[in-house]
């Protein structure tokens, strides 16, 4: 069979002394694999399988620098470093770079934890619901500075674990502070664009100082007129990105802002958004900065991914659901077998639905996904068709 074009996807690129083996990125996703915030054997199997399949850059999503209730990895104590190091070593064995996405939720973690420890569950629920709407406006400057300190400490721990990249999460609390919809503050963190992005810029500069030799990736969460709330407005995104480069950002992951409650905004099922629906916006950022940019959003086959690279709209192609459906993208492309890639159908049944129901990430097209340590599938390939 004729092979789809894949030119450019196998090209290497370099940042801050790190060499990335190709242009294929697994973006930050909530997986549900962590046990009480600890890196689990399920994590190890899943991310190692992606690395073995040829992914060049993996980002571990939603890594919390505090002991939060988020069902995500946590790195707030030195005792957690060895598990992250084991994961980094495992993916490094296949030449893959590992990033951790550091975030802080949009609620007062210490207050919520205190109510939980006192078993005041009704009050805790009320406080959480309140904070999700108003913490952005009510957090004191002292608290915001404390959050920056904790995120920097998390970055240092990640560096000690051998992680290659720190990705700053541009959504959640950080994105809410940037947002014209969520930020109603009247102090130096609210109002004008310069004020709304002040926290993000202070955070970026602080992390740059804390880990001067590491690659800093920034998830640039953008609100469009149609979708999203907790991020920078599309009209302000270029200026914001240029400021962040001045502050020390080495690369951008351009994505739809997802603080909205509507998962179809950022993880659109079939028929809801066109293929590559955020690529043009990534291209607008790329034109304005001199650092690599990754694009994401319904990029589902090798030909489409190659066109993103060839067109100059992005330097890196990030694919979440497509790599759940087939983790062997990289090796199949390298072998000239791109037509064997199992294509994601955007059904959202094994992935998004599972996470929304507090289960773990899986895929209806890939029986291994989430069970990498106990299952192995023999896949049909074009070689078999030629026999």
What are these model-derived regions, one by one?
Residues 60-80, 104-110, 168-191, 255-273:
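Glycine-rich, proline-tolerant flexible connector loops at the mouths of alpha/beta enzymes
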């Amino acid at each position: 069979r004729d092979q789809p074009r894949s030119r450019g996807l196998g090209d290497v690129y370099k940042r801050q002394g790190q060499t990335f083996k190709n242009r294929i990125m697994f973006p930050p996703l909530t997986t549900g694999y962590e046990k009480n915030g600890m890196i689990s054997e399920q994590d190890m199997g899943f991310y190692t399988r992606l690395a073995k399949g040829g992914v060049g850059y993996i980002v571990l999503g939603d890594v919390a620098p505090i002991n939060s209730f988020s069902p995500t990895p946590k790195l707030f104590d030195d005792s957690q470093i060895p598990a992250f190091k084991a994961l980094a070593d495992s993916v490094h064995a296949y030449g893959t770079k590992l990033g951790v996405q550091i975030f802080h939720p949009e609620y007062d973690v210490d207050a919520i934890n205190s109510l939980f420890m006192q078993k005041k569950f009704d009050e805790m629920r009320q406080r959480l619901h309140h904070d999700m709407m108003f913490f952005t406006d009510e957090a004191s400057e002292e608290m915001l500075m404390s959050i920056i300190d904790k995120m920097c400490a998390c970055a240092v721990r990640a560096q000690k674990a051998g992680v290659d990249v720190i990705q700053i999460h541009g959504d959640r609390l950080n994105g809410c502070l940037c947002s014209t919809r969520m930020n109603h503050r009247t102090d130096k963190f609210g109002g004008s664009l310069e004020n709304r992005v002040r926290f993000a810029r202070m955070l970026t500069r602080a992390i740059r100082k804390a880990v001067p030799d590491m690659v800093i990736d920034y998830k640039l969460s953008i609100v469009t007129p149609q979708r999203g709330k907790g991020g920078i407005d599309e009209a302000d995104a270029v200026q914001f990105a240029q400021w962040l480069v001045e502050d020390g950002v080495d690369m951008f992951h351009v994505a739809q802002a997802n603080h909205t409650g509507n998962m179809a905004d950022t993880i659109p099922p079939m028929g809801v958004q066109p293929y590559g629906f955020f690529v043009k916006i990534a291209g607008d950022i790329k034109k304005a900065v001199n650092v690599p940019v990754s694009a994401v959003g319904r990029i589902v086959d090798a030909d489409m991914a190659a066109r993103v690279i060839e067109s100059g709209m992005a330097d890196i192609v990030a694919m979440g659901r497509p790599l759940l459906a087939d983790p062997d993208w990289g090796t199949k492309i390298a072998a000239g077998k791109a037509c064997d890639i199992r294509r994601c159908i955007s059904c959202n049944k094994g992935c998004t639905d599972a996470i929304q129901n507090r289960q773990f990430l899986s895929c209806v097209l890939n029986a291994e996904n989430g069970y990498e340590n106990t299952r192995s599938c023999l896949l049909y390939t074009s070689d078999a068709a030629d026999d």
